[in-house]
């Protein structure tokens, strides 16, 4: 029904669209083949099925929406409690919180494939088995990754074809991030990690990718790392000096350094910051064949 700025219980398909104006509200809407919901007001309990599209403009808000396989959610306003159960969500300079990504779905922060939006932000992101999250620009604050993959792209590797909002494309990770069993996080060189605390549990993998850096030295800067049986990979090209700067590194686990350097010196890797616990260093070549292992990191 639609009455006096309020819509409820509609099925939109076959090119049918509904625009929710500022101050108006829509709830319990189903979007199917080529059905669209355009939101400048507020909406809730929207289900987006294959071929459907939900668009929330600046000033608009959406909550408790479900994006299924083949569905698309484009966000430039605000969203909360979104379930990506197989579809795609692009945050284009908006803000979302408590988003769940799973079952083959893809979440992207900061891009629509054409422009980078540095003002976007996601908070309390959950990436479960089969889910994938990509941060092209903007801020990721607090995340739990369980069986899924999160990629923070290097802000220095933006394609020339992108239009960059405000002539910059910062990528920032803040708050608490937990990598559980089967989870992986890949972070491109240059992303701002200073205000983050990353915990890597048994079976979890954190990768800091410095392979784009040319020259003899690479420095990785990060806030706090807790290794609870997990692994930290440092990827370099041909650098002969690698430094990991941390506020605090503690726990039990391994730091694995992958390099193409032909010569490995005893001081090849240096860790600067507070170090506690039982942490070992392994060094491998580009094919991950061990060059040196079982070196205990000295506090």
Sequence positions of predicted segments:
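Fold-core signature of tandem repeat domains
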Residues: 7-12, 18-20, 26-31, 37-39, ...
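N-terminal non-cleavable signal-anchor helices
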Residues: 3, 21, 40, 47-49, ...
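Generic short alpha-helical hydrophobic face used as a protein-protein interaction/packing hotspot
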Residues: 24, 60, 277-279
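Short, solvent-exposed secondary-structure boundary motifs
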Residues: 1-2, 18-22, 35-39, 54-58, ...
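Detector for Asparagine
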Residues: 14-17, 40, 64, 68, ...
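A short, compositionally biased
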Residues: 109-111, 229
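Extracellular beta-strand/loop-rich repeat segments of large surface/secreted proteins
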Residues: 99, 146, 151-297
């Amino acid at each position: 029904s639609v009455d006096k700025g309020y819509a409820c219980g509609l099925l939109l398909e076959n090119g049918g669209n509904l625009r929710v104006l500022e101050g108006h509200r829509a709830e319990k809407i189903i979007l199917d083949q080529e059905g669209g919901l355009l939101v400048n007001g507020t909406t809730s309990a929207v289900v987006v099925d294959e071929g459907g599209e939900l668009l929330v403009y600046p000033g608009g808000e959406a909550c408790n929406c479900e994006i299924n396989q083949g569905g698309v959610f484009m966000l430039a306003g605000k969203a909360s409690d979104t379930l990506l159960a197989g579809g795609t969500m692009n945050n284009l300079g908006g803000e979302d919180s408590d988003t769940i990504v799973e079952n083959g779905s893809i979440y992207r922060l900061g891009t629509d494939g054409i422009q980078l939006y540095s003002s976007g932000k996601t908070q309390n992101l959950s990436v479960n088995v089969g889910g994938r999250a990509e941060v092209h620009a903007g801020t990721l604050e607090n995340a739990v990754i369980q069986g899924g993959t999160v990629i923070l792209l290097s802000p220095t590797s933006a394609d020339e074809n992108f239009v960059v909002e405000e002539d910059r494309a910062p990528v920032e990770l803040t708050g608490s991030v937990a990598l559980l069993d089967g989870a992986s996080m890949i972070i491109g060189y240059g992303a701002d990690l200073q205000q983050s605390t990353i915990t890597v549990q048994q079976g979890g993998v954190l990768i800091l990718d410095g392979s784009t850096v040319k020259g003899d030295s690479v420095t990785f800067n990060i806030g706090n790392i807790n290794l609870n049986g997990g692994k930290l990979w440092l990827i370099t090209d041909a650098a002969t000096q690698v430094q990991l700067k941390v506020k605090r590194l503690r726990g039990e686990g391994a730091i694995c350094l992958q390099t193409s350097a032909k010569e490995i010196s005893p001081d090849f890797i240096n860790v600067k910051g507070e170090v506690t616990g039982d942490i070992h260093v392994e060094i491998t070549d580009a094919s991950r064949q061990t060059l040196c292992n079982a070196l205990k990191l000295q506090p």
